[in-house]
């Protein structure tokens, strides 16, 4: 009898051993939750550090080809953290801009893209600085191009190594934004432009979650290039009076905020009109 009971226990317990674990309904696993190659969050961080180190080496080479600077000038060549740093940097760059035009432009271009790619604060000061260093049309094109390229590089970086981190630390926010993107899938460029003009979502969040929720790279770049133009217009215009500013907040006036609000509404109007037209036709 004892043997028979033992046999029954083994037969009853065996299906439990062989049964495959099912994912919990409370924490659904997102589609494609693993990055290519099934890299873990730890491996992704390691790859990110390696890519950052390589990019920093490129930045070092760019600034190594900079003209010979005095000791005092060398101390001012750094990523601006406040308006005083931006003024000091503007003084040095304006001195060498005419003689070493290509080197200064390349250094500005590379630095802006570097900051955008790795979501490092400071690009707002470079936008203001462009208005001080260059003619307005060139400054606006330069800032829009750098923002578009830098954000696209951040997008690709997130696509390659950032997915595990997004799923681990930003799952809930990414899922909420994914639902919003699905609602505007037919008018995604207008939606990206609207988000870039308005402060509803941080730019770094848009950059790193867009590849995870399947925003196409082409749409992402174009929406960013066009969407950053209005805020950049304000910053560049403020750069013409750089030395009168004491903080970055002074670059934005009530008039400029009103203009940005109007442009944000204009960017989303075609979507509203098309939806109303579709409702009437139906």
Swiss-Prot record:
Topology versus the membrane, per the UniProt entry?
Multi-pass membrane protein
Q: Name one GO cellular component term.
A: mitochondria-associated endoplasmic reticulum membrane contact site
Chain intervals for the UniProt region annotation (VTT domain): 131-242
Q: What Gene Ontology terms describe what this protein does at the molecular function level?
A: phospholipid scramblase activity
Identify the stretch(es) annotated as Disordered. Answer: 1-36
Q: Does the keyword Endoplasmic reticulum apply?
A: yes
Recorded catalytic activity of this chain's protein? a 1,2-diacyl-sn-glycero-3-phospho-L-serine(in) = a 1,2-diacyl-sn-glycero-3-phospho-L-serine(out); cholesterol(in) = cholesterol(out); a 1,2-diacyl-sn-glycero-3-phosphocholine(in) = a 1,2-diacyl-sn-glycero-3-phosphocholine(out); a 1,2-diacyl-sn-glycero-3-phosphoethanolamine(in) = a 1,2-diacyl-sn-glycero-3-phosphoethanolamine(out)
Task: Provide the transmembrane region boundaries.
Answer: 43-63, 102-122, 138-160, 188-208, 216-236, 251-271
Q: Does the keyword Nucleotide-binding apply?
A: no
Q: Which family does it belong to?
A: Belongs to the TMEM41 family.
* Free-text comment on this protein's domains from its UniProt entry: The VTT domain was previously called the SNARE-assoc domain. As there is no evidence that this domain associates with SNARE proteins, it was renamed as VMP1, TMEM41, and TVP38 (VTT) domain.
Q: What's the stated role of this polypeptide?
A: Phospholipid scramblase involved in lipid homeostasis and membrane dynamics processes. Has phospholipid scramblase activity toward cholesterol and phosphatidylserine, as well as phosphatidylethanolamine and phosphatidylcholine. Required for autophagosome formation: participates in early stages of autophagosome biogenesis at the endoplasmic reticulum (ER) membrane by reequilibrating the leaflets of the ER as lipids are extracted by atg2 (atg2a or atg2b) to mediate autophagosome assembly.
**What protein is this chain from?**
Transmembrane protein 41B
What organism does this protein naturally occur in?
Answer: Danio rerio (Zebrafish)
The primary gene name is tmem41b
